[in-house]
From Swiss-Prot:
Belongs to the gamma-glutamyl phosphate reductase family. PROSITE patterns: PROA. It comes from the Bacteria. It catalyses: L-glutamate 5-semialdehyde + phosphate + NADP(+) = L-glutamyl 5-phosphate + NADPH + H(+). Keywords: Amino-acid biosynthesis, Cytoplasm, NADP, Oxidoreductase, Proline biosynthesis. It is an enzyme of class 1 (oxidoreductase). One of its GO terms (molecular function) is glutamate-5-semialdehyde dehydrogenase activity. GO terms for cellular component: cytoplasm. One of its GO terms (biological process) is L-proline biosynthetic process. This is Gamma-glutamyl phosphate reductase. It comes from Symbiobacterium thermophilum (strain DSM 24528 / JCM 14929 / IAM 14863 / T). It is found in: Cytoplasm. Pfam families: Aldedh (PF00171).
Amino acid sequence: MDVRSMARQARAAQRQLELTSPEERNAALEAIARALEARAGQIVAANRADLAAAEEAGLPGPMIARLRLDEGKLAGVIRGVRAVAELPDPLAVEPQAWIRPNGLRIQRVRVPLGVVGIIYESRPGVTVDAAVLCLKAGNAVLLKGGKEAARSNAALGEAMAAGLQEVGLPVELAQVLPSTREAAQELMAARSLVDVLIPRGGAGLIRATVEQSQVPVIETGTGVCHVYVHRAADLAMAREIVLNAKCSNPAVCNAAETLLVDREVAAPFLAEAGPALLAAGVRLRACPEALAILQETARPDLAGAGPAAVEPATEEDWAAEYLDLCLAVKVVSGLDEALAHIARYGTGHSEAIVTGDAGAADRFLRSVDAAAVYHNASTRFTDGGEFGFGAEIGISTQKLHARGPMGLAELTTYKYVVLGNGQVR
């Protein structure tokens, strides 16, 4: 079946879902969780086949890591489904209401977006995470995953269909599209049938979707995130923040990719942070000034880390989203240069300053144009769960409709209900 036909079916199914109660939608999520549990063996086996094919094709290690969906990760996905069911219903919000002088009663009520398309790469868990968020908010969803996860996504889609069928809802509410480039092109062209498209993946995928899609796009994800160590920073605190921002999960979009350090504290800070980063397996790409400091202060650590552990940074490094244990390091003259660097190379995701100077922190927080800005905390907190929103569909780096972690509320819009008694204008 072609994508436009699948989108038409999704539109019809969504109209049916829109009439259901919160309790009915939650029952559907619980049925999906049970179906995933019942089919866990088939899902994990399908994922093993995807992993074997990926290794044979020589895909990069970080991509293979993102592709993996073993028993433990699948159990986490299932817990996530049940956690979404426990979240407050985004449509059951008390409407804003007012009465006009002519007697018209106007209400602004929350409604689903409609049909949501998701284009994503190697993470099969996104198939379920995205689907249940969309369903909870009253939307149908079309899921276009990467070809490297085709078997996993198909198995997950079959389980979700079984869950929907169990509670009497249309299986067309959550459809896994073919993993072909043609399917992606058809989805991006389905403007009258798909209400919004959300790409989740690397910079290339997001850029291609934004440039080619005729469907409105919410741009997510690309995270060239910076941690700036100001001259008034607590250096021990800064060291722990940098280690967490880079090393706790380097393959995600809220991980730090560039470290900026004020010249006044560069030598003592890099003397402590450099060896700690190298010990954690991080490769450093440093400006000339940082390189000289690292080569002098971290010489014993460099001897054990290998020749590629610290190298001169290139222009490409400042704009790189490594998604790996690699960090660009630059010494700056002060706050002005740090702000200019972030304005030039940042992607509007998450930016952090470490400082004890309230004035410098305030200027940084006001000046940096990003979805999330931090003072004395790791960029790794840019996450729906960490912000208290529950699960998220992605992290928006644009300004219209949604910005930052996108929870259930961001999968809705509103309409006006106007109640009259014969008024004319």
